[in-house]
Amino acid sequence: GLGDVYKRQVPFVYAAEESIASSELSNDIQVSKPEYATGNMEADGLLEPVTEDDPEYHKYLENNDPYGIMTMSALWGADSLTHQNRFSGVSKVYGIDVSYYQGNIDWKKVKNSGVEFVIIRVGYRGYGSAGTLVEDPRFKTYLDGATKAGLKVGVYFYTQAITTAEAKAEAKFVLDKIKGYSLQMPVYYDIESVDYDTGRLDSAGLSKAQKTALCTAFCDTIIKSGYSAGVYANYTWLNYYIDGAGLGKKYPIWLAHYTSNTNYDQRMDMWQYSGSGTVSGISAYTDVNVWYSGKLPLYVSDLISVKNN
């Protein structure tokens, strides 16, 4: 998931310098040993959640890997990943996603390390029964810093909606937070289960069609305001819990699958292939992604004409 675990009992391999093509990225990005994030999170005071029901918090405190075992080095270069044949003629653009739990970030170092884009958590709906909407405390700081550093920026919202009305409310919450900002990447709807607890979404027992409708309600509300919208989900959710194929006919799909060679066969615009990358300028583990495109998505200004069509 987004900003996945900081304690992970899988093989960690440091990157050999020659593993990354110098023309692509620097050697500042590599897989870290498990102690890396533990110590740095303690130093940054990040071992407390934003709120008690922040659905992402548990990912940093449990040994959990919901999307498959990562047995590779989480590098940016193509040496680490096997890309599907359908992407053989497509440019690969590498980036990260971050939330409060990445701590204080030196965005200049991030940019210099070879990162080209960042997806920032706007906020989340609490996974408790109240379902309170909460802004990520570092959202605006991250957005300003990443923008000034020259990174392409998108955002995501971690849902715990159980009705389409709540999904639309989440979209309006996001639109209010990003008002006045320029985004070059989509607004993503992060739909997944809460790790090591039962969130309100799972407790609701919604059908596949109902959970898919949540995604549609959120994305369509975002699109009506002139932004691009997409869906983030892991391999299991896209295949079994929501209609990944159907959603892919309308929106960009951001797949989370922690492996060096995903076999997901539906639309996949971006692949989050590890939650344990380390990036210069960030002290905690960071999710790493590859965007399959000859160029990054249209700027928001290019999408405004769609609004009234």
Predicted regions and their residues:
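Substrate-binding cleft of extracellular glycoside hydrolase catalytic domains
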Residues: S88-C219, I223-S225
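Surface-exposed substrate-engagement region within the catalytic domains
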Residues: K177-V187, I191-N308
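A generic short-segment signal for beta-strand/edge and adjacent turn/coil regions
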Residues: E62-Y67, N85-G89, F157-T159, I222-G226, ...
